[in-house]
Design a protein with these regions (language model features):
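Membrane-water interface of transmembrane alpha-helices
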Residues: 114-124
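Hydrophobic alpha-helical transmembrane segments of integral membrane proteins
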Residues: 13-14, 22-26, 76-79
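Cytoplasmic-side transmembrane-helix entry/capping segments in multi-pass membrane proteins
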Residues: 78-82, 109-110, 135-141
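C-terminal membrane-associated helical module and adjoining short loops/tails
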Residues: 1-17, 27-28, 47-55, 125, ...
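Active-site His/Glu-centered metal-binding helix of metallohydrolases
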Residues: 26, 56-64, 81, 85, ...
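Membrane-embedded alpha-helical segments that form the functional core of polytopic membrane enzymes
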Residues: 27-74, 90-111, 165-182
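Transmembrane helix-loop junction
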Residues: 35, 66-67, 96-97, 123, ...
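Core segments of transmembrane alpha-helices
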Residues: 24-31, 82-93, 118-119, 141-153
């Protein structure tokens, strides 16, 4: 039994798309350690490099999975987890090094809360076999969010963009991503609530139908008494 399972497990892990997804997870602690323990500006650029590589794998793992016919349940399970680990880790380390501080923590908190909300909704909807497609607006949110976090990782080591520093450009992008996060999060929440209500209705109907015929008379007698 073991010899049959081992090649399957190895094959799953050694598929190129899955290896890229795993590489994205491996890059997370590397960029965190670089930003915290190395000296600036080297720390900023090393962290940015790991982050950029992680973002690139986010595109290519899905693309290659489709192109090579290597789509798998493991990849579908791991890919969104890797994305959320990357976003959450970068936001937290940016707060830790004071790149995000004061009122700028608010959009970071909004983005984190939305990630948790969407994860919960996706898990629930997957159980009832209801797809939760990614909207065009959500893709724009992800793009702006990725760019903003990249600017913030570079921070003071980056160039000036007219009157704005690299950090300020990142902060503006973070606010924009947070705004889109609220809009897309509300859309997902509405869809989720509707599906939850539908599931509850079906459950209530299934509970009423089996007992309705035999208990009708008894129910009336109890009410009358």
């Amino acid at each position: 039994m073991c010899p049959r399972e081992t090649p399957g497990a190895l094959g799953m892990l050694t598929k190129i798309p899955n290896m890229l997804t795993i590489g994205r997870i491996v890059a997370i602690p590397l960029l965190v350690v670089a930003l915290i323990f190395l000296e600036a500006p080297l720390a900023n650029w090393i962290a940015f490099t790991f982050y950029t590589l992680a973002c690139v794998t986010d595109f290519f793992d899905g693309y290659l999975a489709r192109a090579l016919g290597q789509q798998s349940a493991f990849g579908r399970f791991l890919d969104p987890i890797a994305d959320k680990l990357l976003v959450a880790s970068v936001l937290l380390v940016l707060v830790g090094v004071d790149r995000i501080s004061d009122v700028t923590v608010l959009p970071a908190a909004v983005i984190l809360c939305r990630e948790i909300l969407v994860s919960g909704l996706r898990e629930f909807l997957a159980e009832v076999r209801v797809p939760m497609p990614v909207t065009a607006l959500a893709k724009w949110k992800t793009t702006i969010q990725m760019l903003a976090l990249g600017f913030l990782l570079v921070g003071p080591a980056g160039p000036e963009f007219g009157p704005l520093s690299t950090t300020e450009v990142g902060v503006i992008g973070l606010w924009g991503a947070a705004l889109l996060t609220l809009v897309t999060g509300a859309d997902y929440l509405i869809v989720g609530i509707r599906q939850i209500a539908a599931v509850d209705e079906r459950a209530a109907d299934s509970e009423e139908k089996p007992g309705s015929s035999p208990d009708t008379g008894g129910g009336k007698m109890r009410k009358a008494g």
